[in-house]
Amino acid sequence: MRRWHVIGLAVLAVLALACDGTGMARPAQSGTRSAVSWPSSMAALGDSITAGFGSCFTLVACERRSWSTGSDSAVDSHYRRIREANAKIRGQAHNYAKPGARAADLNSQARAAVAAKAQYVTVLIGANDACARRVQDMTPVRTFRTQIDAALRTVKKSLPRSRVLVVSIPDLYRLWQLGHDDEQAVRAWNAGICPALLANPTSTGIADGRRRRQVANRIDAYNRQLADACRAYGTRCRWDNGEVHNVRFSLDLVNHLDYFHPNSEGQARLAEVTWPGRISW
């Protein structure tokens, strides 16, 4: 075999080793240390939080400031962090999160992620399932889990090599604790923000306290189901270990229009606590 043929085959072999077959960029290995795979596309699934609602000074979705796929420098999103390591993801960050979305809406978003062939998928859902008009209207825990499983199954079936990050629901009860004696927050909440939790926000009566605790308990139950669903998914799913729920946020991290959704600083905080460091699971 001629020498240039040998060299050509060697180059092809190196190129093959540098790609894992999914299109993910892989840095060169150092010794026996495994290479880190950086996705070249991603999708965000969820509700108004991930849609960046209220993060751009008005009460509309503002995807550019999403903790997941945002492009704005004010929020060091997952997309921006990945882009620093893999420029191929530029323009390939898809945000399918919708204000008002519940777990029942997640499967349609998952199908969109499949159509986009997303190599990295973030999931933050459940706040609206708890923020019903009445406590009895909250999504039952078993139903919630069934809907989460259906969406994750859609991703796994069509994108078995993609990485999935499932994020915990924020501690909405803490939000009430922080704002129930804040005049501006109370005025905003009285417009109908998360009524199961925030209705009659200044009351410290037994019935209202019991209602709020029911909502808090339901969110805890949802988070347990999210963790279990991710565990059942397998090694390609990463749970945030409750990091978002455990954030000790202040009212400075929510917008001062509805006193509910994260502002740009809040979105940046979400990006920080959910960032896995590298996407190699």
Q: Language-model segments: what does each one mean?
A:
Residues 1-25:
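Secretory targeting and sorting signals
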Residues 23-93:
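Serine-esterase "nucleophile elbow" of acetyl-processing enzymes
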Residues 37-38, 89, 117, 160, ...:
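Residue-level preference for short coil/turn positions at secondary-structure junctions
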Residues 51, 102, 173:
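Flexible, glycine-rich phosphate/dinucleotide-binding loops
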Residues 75-78, 105-113:
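Alpha-helical scaffolding within the catalytic cores
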Residues 91-103:
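Functional beta-strand-loop-alpha-helix junction segments that form "active/interaction loops"
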Residues 108-257, 261-264, 272-281:
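Alpha-helical cap/lid subdomain in secreted, periplasmic
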